[in-house]
Amino acid sequence: MQALRSLIYTMLMVLITGVTGVIVILSALLPLTIKQRYVIPRTWGLFLTWLAGAICGLKYTVEGQENLPQQPFISLWKHSSTWDTFAQMFVVPPAAWLLKREVIWIPIVGWAVSTYKPIAINRSAGHSAVNQVIKQGRER
């Protein structure tokens, strides 16, 4: 039964993510700031997390949110599942995303992500990738 629920959730997640990607791309044409448009990925993350709870029984606890600094900061997540991608959208405040540059080449999803002007790095570039993150991070 769990396998069937997981399959249903995955199919809905792919559909919802595709539709959300199109909405994000279209929203980039509006005279809105990135921060104003951030409501879209935030809602996407909240909805997919709720859906995972409703269909698959996902339960989670966020601890330490009160310790997030008020000034800009770097949030590092050990990427262990698809869920942590969703959670980042609503657990931390709107942020500049850091990702491997290949992600922006993914049709619809990557194009949508690129409208938020992420810091896209070449992970094989070593130290120069770190310098790129520092430089672009300071600019934001």
Residue ranges and their predicted role:
Residues 1-61, 111-112:
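A transmembrane-helix-recognition feature enriched in membrane-embedded lipid enzymes
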Residues 55-140:
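Soluble catalytic domains of membrane acyltransferases
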